[in-house]
C-alpha cells in the first residue's frame, strides 16, 4: 500500500525583502520632505540650531534651593514616599501572598536613592 502525504494549498518559498529594498525612490522623497524644512530653519536661524551653546544662562537656577528643600535627602516628601511604598507593599503582600510585592519597596527605595544621587539632590 502506498501512502501519500498531501498538504492543502500550494507551498511556495517566501521571499525575504532585502535591506536595500527600504531605500526606494518614494522613501527617499519622504525623507527629503522631512529633512529639508529642518535644514532650512537651521540655516536661517542658526541661534536656534546652536541653542545649547555656552553663552546661555540657566533660567531655573533660582529654584535649586527650593527643589533641594522639597525633594532632598532630609525632606519629608522622601520619607512619606518610602512610608507609602512600605504600606502598599505590605497590603499587596497580604492580598496576593506574593513575596515580590513585599520586597518591592526595598528595590524602589534603592532606585529612589540612586535617582536622587544622579540628579544631585
UniProtKB/Swiss-Prot annotation:
Keyword Transmembrane helix: yes
Gene Ontology cellular-component annotations: extracellular region; plasma membrane
Annotated membrane topology: Multi-pass membrane protein
Cytoplasmic side: 97-100
Transmembrane region(s): 76-96, 101-121
Record's keyword annotation contains Magnesium: no
Residue(s) carrying N-acetylalanine: 52
Spans within the Periplasmic topological domain: 1-75
Chain positions listed as propeptide in the UniProt record: 1-51
Domain of life assignment: Bacteria
Primary localisation category: membrane
Location within or outside the cell: Cell inner membrane; Secreted
UniProt entry keywords in alphabetical sequence: Acetylation, Cell inner membrane, Cell membrane, Conjugation, Membrane, Plasmid, Secreted, Transmembrane, Transmembrane helix
Primary role: Propilin is the precursor of the pilus subunit, pilin, that forms conjugative pili, the filamentous surface appendages required for cell-to-cell contact during the earlier stages of bacterial conjugation, and that retract after contact is established. Mature pilin is assembled with the help of TraQ and TraX.
Subunit architecture: Monomer. Interacts with itself to form filaments; also interacts with TraQ.
Family stated for the protein in its record: Belongs to the TraA family.
Name used for this protein in its record: Pilin
Organism: Escherichia coli
Amino acid at each position: 500500500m502506498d501512502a501519500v502525504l498531501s498538504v492543502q494549498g500550494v507551498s511556495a518559498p517566501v521571499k525575504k525583502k532585502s535591506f536595500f529594498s527600504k531605500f526606494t525612490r518614494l522613501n527617499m522623497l519622504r525623507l527629503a520632505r522631512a529633512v529639508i524644512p529642518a535644514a532650512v530653519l537651521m540655516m536661517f536661524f542658526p541661534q536656534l540650531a546652536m541653542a545649547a551653546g555656552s553663552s546661555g544662562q540657566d533660567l531655573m537656577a533660582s529654584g535649586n534651593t527650593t527643589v533641594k528643600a522639597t525633594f532632598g535627602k532630609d525632606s519629608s516628601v522622601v520619607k512619606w514616599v518610602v512610608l507609602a511604598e512600605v504600606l502598599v507593599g505590605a497590603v499587596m503582600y497580604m492580598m496576593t501572598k506574593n513575596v515580590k510585592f513585599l520586597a518591592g519597596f526595598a528595590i524602589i527605595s534603592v532606585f529612589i536613592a540612586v535617582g536622587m544621587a544622579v540628579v544631585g539632590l
